[in-house]
Amino acid sequence: MPATPSFMKLKVDHKTVLCRDLNTYRALRDFLLNSGYSPVYETDRVGEERTATATFACLSSLTGERLAVVLGMSAPNEVSHAQAPFAYGFAGKPQKDAQTYMQHLALRTNDVEKLKSHLESKGAAFLTPIYKDKDSFGPLLQSFTRELFDDEWFFIEFVQRDYDADTVGAGGTQFVQNTVKSLYVSKQEEFREWEKTGKKRKFLDGVPAKDRTKLLQEIFANTEPKGYVQTVAPIARNVSLG
């Protein structure tokens, strides 16, 4: 068996959870701040003129885990994509009691350009180009896939931090405002297309059907810490990693 390329040796960078309403958003933010997490990014509004999100991101200095909490803000005549799980349901059914939804998992690589090219060569589809910017600690490169599953709103982010992200700790900004806004606009355009057509262009549509599960397993099996991916509900519902 050939050795795993270094760019495929992935590590969880952060995960992003969507909130149904302002009360849920505030409660989750308050809980995290009272559980040893420190803020690393916050904005009250970023997006388009009519729809947007509020975002709070934090870091646990004890575990190194980063979490982003997002509230979608819809307009009277337009739903924010960040409200899609609550407006349209997920896991194949309406979800009137759901207060949160795990929107995406960010996986860190040492070379996002090689990783993106590798996956695209197999037929995988990305929603965005590679955004190149800097946070408080150094260069930050990010690219986002199209959604993975028909009955979910879940996607993957691949991120490259050109500094030791495991040792910087709290303090400073570890997300980039321009990238957050660019992602919002791209996701909202993708969501409008889905509302119009009822069809999703998914991450693995261009991969031969027989190879799709294998490619996901290749990504997730090479992700540290082992077992973390299985705790992400949309993945656990759709992919067998055993």
Model-derived segments and spans:
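Catalytic cores of carbohydrate-active enzymes
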Residues: 44-45
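Glyoxalase I/VOC metalloenzyme domain signal
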Residues: 1-41, 50-242
